[in-house]
């Protein structure tokens, strides 16, 4: 690690601690050349699979798009931001757990629907109506009937 003060390459770690619920390591370092101290944070770089769209195009996974869809479905619903973040992390973990380099967009949509079904039934219906392109009231009724079973 280069010292941010003198650019020397020799530094030593004085202290290491887990932060962010164990997902990050905070290290206190000291430069061996100028004796200045500084803090670094280390976390794993997790690679998300590419998304195969329904038209066959491939694009990088977009976390903002995923969270935007979840938050839009949950707009004005009594669900805490912490629960939404937990749902987002669950979806991302499930995608990484596939071990695939590419996943179809409908898989992501189904994972979102599974999470919304647990979080809020109204948000689930909102998302399903757009995701499945409901054409009329009958389709809403059928989806609601499935939820009530």
Curated annotation (Swiss-Prot):
Which UniProt keywords are present, listed alphabetically? ATP-binding, DNA-binding, Metal-binding, Nucleotide-binding, Repressor, Transcription, Transcription regulation, Zinc, Zinc-finger
Q: Which GO terms describe its biological process?
A: negative regulation of DNA-templated transcription
A GO molecular function annotation here is: ATP binding
InterPro entries xref list? ATP-cone_dom, NrdR-like_N, RNR_NrdR-like
Domain ATP-cone as annotated: residue spans:
49-139
Cofactor remark: Binds 1 zinc ion.
Q: What does this protein do?
A: Negatively regulates transcription of bacterial ribonucleotide reductase nrd genes and operons by binding to NrdR-boxes.
**What is the similarity comment for this entry?**
Belongs to the NrdR family.
In Swiss-Prot or TrEMBL terms, this protein is called Transcriptional repressor NrdR
Provide the organism lineage as a comma list: Bacteria, Pseudomonadati, Pseudomonadota, Gammaproteobacteria, Vibrionales
Q: Which gene encodes it?
A: nrdR
